[in-house]
Amino acid sequence: MPTIELERVSKFYKPKRRRKGPFHTLVGVEEVDLTIRQGEFVFVVGDSGSGKSALLRLIAGEERPDQGKVFVDRKEPGGILRIGRSWTEMMFGKIWQELTLIRKKTIGQNLALASRIVYGKEQPQVVDIRIKKVLGLVGLKGVEEKYPVELSIGECRRVELARALIGSPPILLLDEITANLDGDSVWDTLHLLNDVNLKGTTVIMATGESQYVNILRRRVVTMSEGRVIGDVQKGKYGDVLERERKPFVITRVPNRFDIEKTSIRN
């Protein structure tokens, strides 16, 4: 089972040079040591610019560290080929901040494209069965012929989750996926992620929100200025940031959380 290990990982960015003024290197992450074991549900929290997104991109192999090493299943993420598809595609399901569904394609066509990227060319009936299965998992049966514009933002997020799950990856990487969702959509997304995690999938979710992190009480890795400043097995969003006297975002989610929260808390 794949374990994720970061060993003193640093990543720096060079901003575009201004016509006047000094040239400053931006810190993505700095000297991060972190181990995440298979089956964990981990929130990566912190202010905007704290390094959450950079950390996920490094784990996914979409960026290379300037210093240190990233290992997933004791391999460095990259373009290692295995059984006709890349090792990275086998390991990760990814959802980034912006919606990335192709608007001119139906939901079924979007998922069929993802299936082909992962598995290669297959018989149409095999692809159709797989699509129906993942849409059923996210509670969206019968939307194959609809276009993204016909769905709500919350439903589009669930389609993206179905797309991320189509290759049955052992690890899900999620970056601010509940931003701009209403309370009910956030709640539905949390239930789905909780169910996926209970089946053994590792879930790593970067967020700048607080309410549902505090409800779920899973492992919380706190970042500030590119560094990991806290790592609590069953923590709350502000535990470490308050001690560090750093500001943090408070997002109020409707009271449905307070009514039903015990159903998904361990």
Where are these regions (language model features)?
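Catalytic Walker B motif of ABC-type/P-loop ATPase nucleotide-binding domains
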Residues: 172-175
